[in-house]
Amino acid sequence: MLVLGIESSCDETGLALYDTGRGLLAHALHSQIAMHREYGGVVPELASRDHIRRALPLLEEVLAAGGARREDIDAIAFTQGPGLAGALLVGASIANALAFAWDKPTIGIHHLEGHLLSPLLVAEPPPFPFVALLVSGGHTQLMRVTDVGVYETLGETLDDAAGEAFDKTAKLLGLGYPGGPEVSKLAEAGTPGAVVLPRPMLHSGDLDFSFSGLKTAVLTQMKKLEAAHASGAELDRAKADLARGFVDAAVDVLVAKSLAALKKTRLKRLVVAGGVGANRQLRAALSAAAGKRGFDVHYPDLALCTDNGAMIALAGALRLARWPSQASRDYAFTVKPRWDLASLAR
């Protein structure tokens, strides 16, 4: 089965071809980072308009790279939610228009399910069951994954997502957009232990997260620097130390909660997905913990940590292989800007 995947939930336009027998044949991605940078964040209307411009050229690119014709495609999977309503509508409209014109079925995919399953695209994918740590700009969750479509929420953020905390901290430090990579880069120049920030809910006894207090702690430290009239090299060093303190605190919480989830479920496999899953400090800490605690940790390829069409094509193919009745030829679609992943549990 050959599935075309279309991702357009936020500020990346991604298309891909996934074949159940041959794996990922091709994927193409356009990021809108340069366009949104001057505004300091994603502008939804601009994001939607750019998806319209980029989708069809990317389609031609993946068809050529995958050596496929439209006649070869068996189904079209698209991101149905969650995400920006306008951006989702663009992707859903294009998917259903192509499907109608080509006489193909469609299937709407949960964006986070795509992330959750994306490590299955690696050469040696993790077998079920496993614990999944989903960390992105909008979501931070721990899930028990028994099979495709069989998900149990173990814990989630009560306020800011980890990626959101990274982005807000970047703004407080006067860094550019996107903030997460900028904070991590600055943190590498900081001195470990120079600034120690709180680890919210580290000992809460559950698997939930909270990052708003950590962000507030960064704000408090920045106000102290302003009151001290720090400037020049002194201010640069202080910001690097503060960034290091923030990253260390966030990583400590993510690792500790992941270890607690593995202990609770008695599983030995951890899958990490989402944009924050590309963070070098988080990967290093989890790899070190895996060596000490005797569990396996799996990630998608770095290129597939961000939003992409490959994960949507994969999720569509896996669902259609298990539940062919989920294929639709109605073409009267809806999108779900808010959509709980646990609601997919069968």
UniProtKB/Swiss-Prot annotation:
Keywords of the record: Acyltransferase, Cytoplasm, Iron, Metal-binding, Transferase, tRNA processing
InterPro entries: ATPase_NBD, Gcp-like_dom, KAE1/TsaD, TsaD
CDD domains noted in UniProt: ASKHA_NBD_TsaD_bac
GO molecular function annotations of the record: iron ion binding; N(6)-L-threonylcarbamoyladenine synthase activity
Main subcellular localisation: cytoplasm
EC number, as in UniProt: 2.3.1.234
Annotated binding of Fe cation, by residue: H111, H115, D307
Protein name: tRNA N6-adenosine threonylcarbamoyltransferase
Species the sequence originates in: Burkholderia thailandensis (strain ATCC 700388 / DSM 13276 / CCUG 48851 / CIP 106301 / E264)
Gene responsible for this protein: tsaD
